[in-house]
Amino acid sequence: MTNSLLICFTILGLAASSPTKPIGDIRIVGGEDIVITEAPYQVSVMFRGAHSCGGTLVAADIVVTAAHCVMSFAPEDYRIRVGSSFHQRDGMLYDVGDLAWHPDFNFASMDNDIAILWLPKPVMFGDTVEAIEMVETNSEIPDGDITIVTGWGHMEEGGGNPSVLQRVIVPKINEAACAEAYSPIYAITPRMLCAGTPEGGKDACQGDSGGPLVHKKKLAGIVSWGLGCARPEYPGVYTKVSALREWVDENITNLRLKHILRRF
């Protein structure tokens, strides 16, 4: 496989090699089984009936995910499963009524890898379904602080998906060190953050894309991309929510207003 770069387009169900970017559909490696009550904000983003990406419930009618998970397809191609420890059963299914991805996102750079989904029927909150707060605009995670990543992605590089929700605990990596690790081929921008362990073995991987990275009980990152999975020399790369919080807030408001106005 060219340069060992695995490109997993979960929304298309295709895998191909590329010399340019090792993009997402990331998975949990080195994690542990958990139940949904431990991460009730975690959702499965389903594309035409099958799990394709993770997502995070930030309001009863809003899911945040990665742009590369939903770009170029219609809202009706997606449904959201909430309240289940399993991506293929249980919980409740909700239609996606509309979506927006960042206009400056592109697959070449993976910069601005963020999207929001609007649900015409808000979810019902309970023990297994709950929204999570997002980090504040321009807030920073101190280097070395613990973050939590959850999802149903592959449990090893090139492996299969688990049926039960997984969790992995990884420290936040200094941006300069992360940029040096990926240089000169890949750029770490101000809208990305990195997390992983120096010895490797713990990471997100294929199938986790779009899912949450949580710091101090707030959504701080979105699983985006990486070179391989859980490799010691290459931390996982996440969309930095604090750098894009203003865009998220603005577009949540725009989507809601758009559909309120359509009623009149």
UniProtKB/Swiss-Prot annotation:
Which processes are annotated in GO (biological process)?
proteolysis
For binding substrate, which residues are annotated in this chain's numbering?
D203
This one is known as: Vitellin-degrading protease
- What EC identifiers does the entry list? 3.4.21.-
Keywords for the protein's UniProt record, in alphabetical order = Disulfide bond, Glycoprotein, Hydrolase, Protease, Serine protease, Signal, Zymogen
Disulphide bonds annotated for this chain are: C53-C69, C178-C194, C205-C229
Q: Where is the signal peptide?
A: 1-15
Q: Where is the Peptidase S1 domain?
A: 28-253
Gene3D superfamilies in UniProt: Trypsin-like serine proteases
Give the propeptide segment as residue ranges.
16-27
- Catalytic residues? H68, D113, S209
| Chain's role | Responsible for the degradation of vitellin in eggs at the head pigmentation stage.
CDD domains (alphabetical): Tryp_SPc
Family designation: Belongs to the peptidase S1 family.
Q: Pfam family example for this protein?
A: Trypsin
What processing steps or modifications follow its translation?
Cleavage after Arg-27 leads to beta-VTN protease and subsequent cleavage after Arg-89 leads to alpha-VTN.
